[in-house]
């Protein structure tokens, strides 16, 4: 019997062969009276190990001894057995982790020490990495001042200039801006390094440089080495993990799936090799490891698993277990909280095997206790397992700060200090600065190099203070003992021979290509399931279109008696091909929206591009069978195509190939354009070229010789030829109609009349071409994703002042007046005698300022507020029986004027939910309880006028500047009686207050892409609300994402606001002592939505501390410890369980609660002689002013949106020139009917394509602005009509220019008749047609919840409009039951107008003697006398769609809160 059999025999002695059987486990527990003697167990254990030892190494490292069957897996309820770790199920993994790390805070260190101990016992060294960087420099090329603003004009001149630079004929006007300047240092293994520095100091650039990830747009010099090896000697992306500050994830995946996918791609590194060696040495030394540790290490070292135990471990230590099976979510899909998303970004890299971690601002949105726990876990890993870590944190609390061994302080791209944490204060004291007692050292370090904050820390009273520049600090550090030690160490190169062979990754990917492909296939299948609605909708849409097509080309109406009737069949075939092509259009949006995540993962070397592109192609093939099947099976017989079954299947086969070709084409365009707007325009353009040169619109003989190559490379030509030959060479058409005229069969005559090759082999040529194009486009898609970089993501422009300041700081000069800050005139704090919060202790002069406008102080009280939502489906699936999930459970409290209240609690306590309920921002769910404003019940309409709400996500119009954003808000929210000068003065004062003066002309931009930094955006959000002069302000996490200095600026703003007598409530996550003690009162909630403290903080938080310390069992606060952190730590659910208490019950029995209840009762009564809030109008400005303001903002946004406007002008011009050259001089020919068809084809193609381009490219623009509209409307700035008015009216001038450019070029080149009337009619129809298309696109966005669905809905109508336009089938040939739609189709009216205005009055006879005018009337049904009516109807369509857009915006709100 082999060894494996022996193991099985031993295991089955007790278990009857069941590897994980449950038999008897219910009553047999660890210390049960029935348990076997420990000796017997030990013997059995020894037997198992002996059997394991006999296995060959490969099998031995795959098997471990685990408890079997115990329900919770703790203890050995079902005895122990040998299990293949590769197949561990979720329950076994959870049980194993539960035994190893029951509580992450307490057990993680013990667990890691056990791992280390096992490795140390056999003398294996852990690989470590020492990172050195010497003389690193980085500078960016930027445009200075207004030339960098992305206006339509600038984008054209800058593009031309860059082309000139590349050719060397124009000078480069860009200037260089220093980002990093001559930085050198050493990052040691087994030490935690904290990277600090104000925003813009170059932290991200330094981390990217150290991780080997610097972008090509930076000029960099200097060298970075790992264990003495240069970056080119190994693969830095896999040796080091860079964790970005931007959270890019696929919203439709759960947290667990996201991390599991990442673990699968990154592989297990050298874990398996180490385990093999470990196993070998243990066997030689006869050492038996701890069974659970052995199982964990073996399971974690197995590559190619869909779920790895390591993923579960990371979920545990990051505190993500609670939301592991929740969707990550995005702006349109509800998912996890911001703090949880941040942890997912961290976890995504931690599940991999990288030994060096460079983490960029990983604590944004986390409370201080969570941050502490995560950093502590990282510290244990780094110290025990020998990792290397550099972590930049924004606002580390003192206890988190103390976890680090080394500090790097960066300012203006230079290292001010690098070395042990213990020496940093000594260094600054040597330069004359001292950190006050109740001040976190990290906060002190962030502020001490800043011009605005430095003065308060000056400690040499014998000398007058003067500003010490960064350059002076840098030179002081070089002569300081720590600086000298680093310089000496750098002088001696690292000994490469000491580098562990497994320390640096040398393979490009973490897993074999086959495994990466499999991982991507699994993910793609998952996403297709989650996005199944899109595919179902697409199939449904095709079904609808096929129903229309088959009733339009109905077989009883379809004759086979002439070449003309054959033309109608050709029309039906052409329409089918076009529909199947258009069906692939939604691939464009699906591709582009997944690209940001793809680029992130590709650059981290998760997988090569081909392993991503192949599944996105192959897995769509089964869907094609269903979609195309639906169309062909429904239409083929009903339209009456050739009745031969072979022709039927050949048509189905060809349509499948066409659909695949179209999907591949759109995926390629999406991958190459990488931006939705550009992709839409480009896709329309490609379709247009393929269609016009495809042989149906313009017959082959009519194609100009300079364009004939286009005909031969158009996929549509091959599709059209193949499908026509398949039908018209069939036996139904194999008859001679008029033998005297021609002895060719009818089918051949029809084919020849349309310039199609009348040979049967063209079916297979066409089919082969479709397959060829499919492969080509997929290959091009793969190449695009392999080599292209993400779309426009670097910062392009800076202001003159900013550049001057950067350069001056580099040279140690001082620019401008130093003492310009609010708060910079505080008295210096010698020896830390000043203890109060520096934020509160501000100049009274500041607090009295900025308030030139009066307001009424208001209080807000709420009693027994409950909020619940419908039970989510996932929870119902897990067996939860309730219909509703209660998020707030009877919360009561009050907020008063002049009192700053902090709303706190751990993640998931319901802080934002409570705030949304009180502010009236919830759009769904069930609210109960009473809310009163100064004693009167709250009415949302009036409340919006007196309140401000600063959202956590800073949503602003991207294309306006800071000053313009504030001007817009003030203009619409301040009362009408405030004149323009007072308004501007007030804005200036608010900008001073929020310290935005230096950024007044900076473009806001999109978060994470361009424009303002997180902290500047946050201050803008506050300023936008402040300029409204509200009485009550809600702020959702105003300091999240900010460093200590920025947070202090924001809190100073908040404090100044409160001191003017306003009511301010802030939710807050991880306040420093400074920030926490700037608050007057605290409203504390626990997870589950119950309050556990509401009351004053007291001096140095004394009241709060006294309350919690009076609860028996709560540990006392340590000296100098942050009360906010202590309070969150002592009130966790774990603490409640340990003490056996419920903090909300304790609070409800306290005297404090009674006092609060009395206060709420008091505030719920109106004051004598007071009256309820009343405003004569809902909005502060008249409708006309609202319209003008919205138009003003839209005007700025459009002018600065070149991806939309410059691109559409460019493409319109290109299309005009193309059409001009393709249809050159065909406008004057009217001798044959085909000449008229050609001229009409030029009109039809232009109308349809430029129209569709406008329609699709306007949608993303409106979708972005709509999210801003939701915020601004909720803030009571304007109603829906003015917004719609602004959005609609601004399109008119742009469309006018677009149509004029097109009209002049095309009219001249095609050679229509040169009379003023005809020219202006042509222009009139083009202008209004482009307008109604644009407004239709806007309407589609207004009527649908998101951009994806809008593009699908609108594309459905393109098809129907195309069909009824009068080109594919003329109106007189349309069956009577569809004739009504010819009158309802806007494109049909446009073509009517264009054809009749050009040809409706021409009396010239054609070759058969019929006057042109008569042919137009008979064949198309177009009468010249109707021209005026036609013009009216076309203009009316534009008006109708614009009105429907306004209506949709007014009635539908798709924001879910």
Swiss-Prot record:
InterPro entries hit by this protein: AAA+_ATPase (IPR003593), ABC2_TM (IPR013525), ABC_trans_N (IPR029481), ABC_transporter-like_ATP-bd (IPR003439), ABCG_dom (IPR043926), ABCG_PDR_2 (IPR034003), P-loop_NTPase (IPR027417), PDR_assoc (IPR013581)
SMART domains given in the database record: AAA
Biased composition (Basic and acidic residues): 28-39
Location of region: Disordered: 14-43, 821-841
Primary subcellular site in the record, as a coarse category: membrane
Cellular component annotations (GO), alphabetically ordered: membrane
Binding site for ATP 1: 197-204
Any single Pfam family the record assigns to this protein: ABC_trans_N
Residues that span the membrane, as ranges: 533-553, 565-585, 621-641, 653-673, 677-697, 706-726, 765-785, 1209-1229, 1244-1264, 1292-1312, 1319-1339, 1349-1369, 1380-1400, 1429-1449
Highest rank taxon of the organism: Eukaryota
Record keywords: ATP-binding, Membrane, Nucleotide-binding, Repeat, Transmembrane, Transmembrane helix, Transport
Binding site for ATP 2: 905-912
Annotated ranges, domain ABC transmembrane type-2: 515-728, 1185-1399
Induction line: In roots. By heavy metals such as zinc (Zn), nickel (Ni) and cobalt (Co). Also induced by some phytohormones including auxin (NAA), cytokinin (BA), jasmonic acid (JA) and abscisic acid (ABA). Triggered by biotic (submergence) and abiotic stresses (ethanol, PEG), as well as by oxidative stresses mediated by antioxidants (DTT and ascorbic acid) and oxidants (hydrogen peroxide).
Subcellular location: Membrane
Domain ABC transporter residues, every copy: 164-437, 860-1112
GO molecular function: ABC-type transporter activity; ATP binding; ATP hydrolysis activity
Its membrane topology: Multi-pass membrane protein
UniProt similarity note: Belongs to the ABC transporter superfamily. ABCG family. PDR (TC 3.A.1.205) subfamily.
PANTHER family documented for this protein: ABC TRANSPORTER G FAMILY MEMBER 39-LIKE, PLEIOTROPIC DRUG RESISTANCE PROTEIN 1-LIKE ISOFORM X1
Function: May be a general defense protein.
Name by which UniProt lists this protein: ABC transporter G family member 36
Species: Oryza sativa subsp. indica
